[in-house]
Amino acid sequence: MLKFSFLFLTVEKPGGLFDFDGTLPLIAIQFLILMFLLNILLYTPLLKIIDERSEYIANNLQEASIILNKANELSSQYEKEFSKIKKEVELDSLTLQNLHKNILEIEIISSQKIFENYLNQTINNFDSEKEKILTSLDEEINSLSSEIITKIVA
């Protein structure tokens, strides 16, 4: 018969995979050391960069909100100035329209007076010419009627 004693030497100890001898705590310690090293070497710089970036973004957002507030203030100020200037322009426009209307009325009245003076002068000239012509016709009629009477009587 064969001796199976060498088989007993190679057989695993009882407990197998879940044996709690010195290797499990050693692996746990190695895991904790690795985790600590990874935290120091990788995660801390990464978290530092993330925090810096977050702070940078927060600062930029704060600056942007300040700029936006200033822009809104300037916009409202410009809108107020624009409405004020628009009212002034409308007032100036009305003033200019009234002034133009008054000047036009004055010119029309002046033109009417000139026309009336010219018309009165023309009518007066016409009346004086009419009187001259009527007087001259009256004289001619008198002279012709005297000639006719003298020719009839003669």
Curated annotation (Swiss-Prot):
InterPro entries: ATP_synth_b (IPR034679), ATP_synth_b/b'su_bac/chlpt (IPR002146), ATP_synthase_B_chain (IPR050059). Keywords: ATP synthesis, CF(0), Chloroplast, Hydrogen ion transport, Ion transport, Membrane, Plastid, Thylakoid, Transmembrane, Transmembrane helix, Transport. It is a single-pass membrane protein. Pfam families: ATP-synt_B. It is found in: Plastid, Chloroplast thylakoid membrane. One of its GO terms (cellular component) is proton-transporting ATP synthase complex. One of its GO terms (molecular function) is proton-transporting ATP synthase activity, rotational mechanism. It comes from the Eukaryota. F-type ATPases have 2 components, F(1) - the catalytic core - and F(0) - the membrane proton channel. F(1) has five subunits: alpha(3), beta(3), gamma(1), delta(1), epsilon(1). F(0) has four main subunits: a(1), b(1), b'(1) and c(10-14). The alpha and beta chains form an alternating ring which encloses part of the gamma chain. F(1) is attached to F(0) by a central stalk formed by the gamma and epsilon chains, while a peripheral stalk is formed by the delta, b and b' chains. In plastids the F-type ATPase is also known as CF(1)CF(0). F(1)F(0) ATP synthase produces ATP from ADP in the presence of a proton or sodium gradient. F-type ATPases consist of two structural domains, F(1) containing the extramembraneous catalytic core and F(0) containing the membrane proton channel, linked together by a central stalk and a peripheral stalk. During catalysis, ATP synthesis in the catalytic domain of F(1) is coupled via a rotary mechanism of the central stalk subunits to proton translocation. Belongs to the ATPase B chain family. This is ATP synthase subunit b', chloroplastic. It comes from Vaucheria litorea.
